[in-house]
Design a protein with these regions (language model features):
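Thiamine diphosphate
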Residues: 1-164
């Protein structure tokens, strides 16, 4: 069992565990939702992204279902939502968050990190986390690549407000 993480504050009923401004944009660029013991990983991801100049907000929703309206509101202020769970990702919490955002017309990409639906060889928790690429550095690398790709996409395809 992981050590409890103190919240910096509670916002909309959601525990905020880490907050990094990144490049000074308004609102978090990446919302990182860490569930249960993966809340520690979410903080590690936020710290690693901050070292790369990427703003983030790492949160623990305190409960997962139903998806809290406050989590949907926080997601609406992000460019990317990342969920991290140590359960099966298919049909897991990340999927529930994605569905809740879609129902609320919040158009933000969601990346789900969790275990694949497969038989796991007998191993320690650490070995499983490592083989599933659920360590903070693995997820941070994936998120940084996604953020970079989103930035290139905006440059290649500006939105109407960017056309000047």
């Amino acid at each position: 069992v992981a050590e409890p993480l103190p919240a910096l504050r509670t916002e909309h009923g959601i525990d905020v565990l880490a907050e990094h401004d990144g490049s000074g944009e308004s609102g978090p660029r990446v919302l990182i939702v860490g569930v249960g013991s993966m809340a520690h990983t979410a903080v590690g991801v936020a710290d690693a992204l901050s070292a790369q100049g990427i703003g983030s907000l790492a949160v623990d929703p305190r409960w997962v279902l139903p998806v809290a309206d406050g989590l949907v509101e926080l997601a609406g202020r992000a460019d990317l939502v990342v969920t991290i769970e140590d359960g099966i990702a298919d049909g897991g919490i990340g999927s529930a968050v994605r569905d809740a955002l879609a129902c609320a017309d919040v158009d933000v990409p969601v990346r789900c990190h969790g275990l694949r639906t497969e038989f796991l060889d007998h191993a320690s928790r650490g070995q499983i986390v490592e083989s599933a690429h659920l360590r903070a550095q693995d997820i941070a690398r994936s998120v940084a690549e996604r953020v970079a790709a989103q930035g290139r996409s905006r440059e290649d395809h500006p939105v109407a407000g960017d056309l000047g």
